[in-house]
Each structure stands twice: as C-alpha cells, then as structure tokens.
C-alpha cells in the first residue's frame, strides 16, 4: 500500500504558538495554510488515492478537503490520528514544553497524555493500516503524529529523538507499507 503522510496547513494557532487538541476550538487554516494546501493538492493531483484519513481536528479535514478537489474521494476521520493531548489546550506551546521538561517522554500534565502514550496510539493506527485493502491513501495529521509515523516507516529513531523530527505545514512523505 502506498501511504502519503502529510501535515495540515498553517493555522491561526500555529501563528500564535498555542497548543490545540480540542476539536471544538476555532482553529482553522490561515490564508498561508490554504495556499500551502492548494500547493500540496496540485503536487498530489495525479496520485490515485482511494481514501483520505484525517484526525478529528478540523484543520486536518480542511486541508484534506482542499487536496480532495482533484480526487473527490471519501475523507474519513480516525481518532488515533489526533494530535497529542497535551493538557495545555489554548495555552502557549512553550508552557507545555516547560511543564514536561523533567521527563519529556513520560510526563503527563493537566490530564493530558505523554509522548509515549501518544506514540502507542499512533502505532495502533499503523496496525489498523496494515489490514486495509487500499492501494493508496493520504493521511493528514499533525507534526507530533507524523513524527511517530516517520520514525516507524524510516526506522532508526529512538523515542528520545522523536521531537528532533521536523515536519513543515503541508509537507508530505511517501511510504510503502508491506502487508
């Protein structure tokens, strides 16, 4: 199976450097994010995707809808693709990182999940992918989620190095999943 993993377009919360893991918050693509998604859509227009799988957060769906203008295929939400539940929704990203600095892999704050909790959730999504019959899928998710996918597909990344992986807005990578 060909899997294209893409991060959502730039959002108002990216501009404000705020955490978001609540689908009810008004987090949306900015004009820059829309242009990024349009550019990615153009680059991916000839790929014969059968489905697009997105996280429950609206910015991923909004990005997928723009890419889907060339495909007109189902867009499905998968809960395991959600961004890390930081416990800092609407608060500065820097505050979140300060709060977990004592144990970046295992720290859980404000009822959120740890990086390792999040990793397990994303690995569960990969197990789900392995039983799908599609030939080509587009997965639209978040940088934190994509770090786990990249580490899995490319290998050689220790848990402590996950956050060293950078994925720009609307950056995508192609992988082949052998079942």
Question: Where do the protein language model's features map onto the residues?
Answer:
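Extreme N-terminal starter segment of soluble prokaryotic enzymes
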Residues: 1-4
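Short beta-strand scaffold positions
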Residues: 54-55, 120, 140-141
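Domain-level recognition of soluble alpha/beta enzyme cores
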Residues: 156-179
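Short, conserved phosphate/pyrophosphate- and ester-handling motifs at nucleotide-, phospho-/glycolipid
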Residues: 8, 142
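Phosphate-handling substructures
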Residues: 27-28, 69-123
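GST superfamily/GST-like fold recognition
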Residues: 143-147, 171
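Active-site-proximal alpha-helix that buttresses catalytic centers in soluble enzyme cores
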Residues: 9-71
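Glycine-rich phosphate-binding loop signature in dinucleotide/nucleotide-binding domains
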Residues: 45-48, 129-136
